[in-house]
């Protein structure tokens, strides 16, 4: 495979400790000319669905790259370490559903391998820091152009772990949908496609709260609840100048009913 000058890096490691720096150090030692794009390291700890959503929303706008992602509550267990080829990119991380939405956003999984080649890994693999000792070294070697097949044996894509399909239920006067993510601003992204808003009127209800269907935040007065199609094409609920998640009392995995008002 041809070398790539880019690695993207997404984790739940936070910024208070040295975990991100340690992984950057591994990458810099192995492939010092490769540029690293830090997508985020503030995924809520262990929140695989949030990490998957952030990664999937980012990769279509990144250059062709090796996408290194670690949100890994099962680190050190029997869960597989994997790398995937998808579209013009490669993805490296745990086999826990984290990578598959991003792979789909890139065009779908073309090949998958389990990361078992000891020559590609750190000298001493910690049971609790696979980001440093497995995933970062593999990402670096792939960025240098090493063949994906050399990382380990092929994995049948149908056996990869998938996240549960979130609920979306169309109804006569609206729909019920699972909360996918809550972003930094408190905006609530639903699993529902924006197309589900098309038949609904401007005046809506989100559960018992009155809301307005609009194009953007400033279409309503400050403090008003609004429903719109977000930048990824999903239905989102927001408050102009406020936090919809706090107003509605919801977190990812909860369900919201959106109906004609």
From Swiss-Prot:
Keywords linked to the UniProt accession: Hydrolase, S-adenosyl-L-methionine
Cystine residue pairs: none
Superkingdom of the source species: Bacteria
Sites annotated Important for activity: 72, 79, 130
Residues the record lists as binding adenosine: 12, 72, 187, 239
GO molecular function, one term: hydrolase activity
Residues making up the signal peptide according to the UniProt record: none
Pfam family, one: SAM_HAT_N
List of residues binding (R)-S-adenosyl-L-methionine: 187, 231, 239
Catalytically driven reaction(s): (R)-S-adenosyl-L-methionine + H2O = adenosine + L-methionine + H(+)
UniProt EC number: 3.13.2.3
Annotated function: Specifically hydrolyzes (R)-S-adenosyl-L-methionine ((R)-SAM), the inactive form of the ubiquitous cofactor SAM, into adenosine and L-methionine. Is stereoselective as it cannot use the active form of SAM, (S)-S-adenosyl-L-methionine, as substrate. Likely plays a role in preventing accumulation of (R)-S-adenosyl-L-methionine in cells; maintenance of (S)-S-denosyl-L-methionine homochirality is important for cellular health given that the (R)-form is largely inactive as a methyl donor and can function as an inhibitor of methyltransferases.
Family as reported in the entry's similarity comment: Belongs to the SAM hydrolase / SAM-dependent halogenase family.
The protein's name: (R)-S-adenosyl-L-methionine hydrolase
Naturally occurring in which organism (per UniProt): Salinispora tropica (strain ATCC BAA-916 / DSM 44818 / JCM 13857 / NBRC 105044 / CNB-440)
């Amino acid at each position: 495979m041809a070398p790539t000058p880019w690695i993207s890096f997404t984790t739940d490691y936070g910024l208070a400790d040295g975990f991100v720096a340690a992984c950057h150090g591994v990458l810099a030692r192995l492939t010092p000319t490769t540029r690293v794009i830090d997508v985020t390291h503030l995924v809520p700890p262990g929140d695989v669905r949030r990490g998957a959503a952030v990664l999937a929303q980012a990769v279509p706008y990144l250059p062709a790259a090796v996408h290194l992602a670690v949100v890994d509550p099962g680190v050190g267990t029997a869960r597989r370490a994997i790398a995937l080829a998808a579209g013009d990119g490669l993805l490296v991380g745990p086999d826990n559903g984290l990578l598959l939405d991003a792979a789909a956003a890139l065009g779908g999984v073309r090949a998958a391998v389990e990361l078992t080649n000891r020559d590609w890994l750190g000298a001493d693999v910690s049971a609790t820091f696979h980001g440093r000792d497995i995933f970062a070294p593999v990402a670096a070697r792939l960025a240098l152009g090493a063949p994906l097949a050399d990382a380990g044996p092929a994995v049948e894509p149908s056996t990869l772990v998938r996240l549960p399909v979130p609920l979306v239920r169309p109804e006569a006067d609206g729909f019920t949908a699972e909360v996918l993510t809550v972003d930094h601003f408190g905006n609530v992204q639903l699993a529902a496609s924006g197309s589900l808003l098309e038949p609904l009127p401007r005046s809506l209800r989100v559960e018992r709260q009155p809301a307005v269907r609009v194009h953007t935040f400033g279409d309503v007065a400050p403090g008003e609840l609004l429903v719109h199609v977000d930048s990824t094409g999903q239905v989102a609920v927001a408050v102009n100048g406020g936090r919809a998640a706090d107003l509605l009392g919801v977190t990812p995995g909860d369900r919201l009913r959106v109906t004609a008002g």
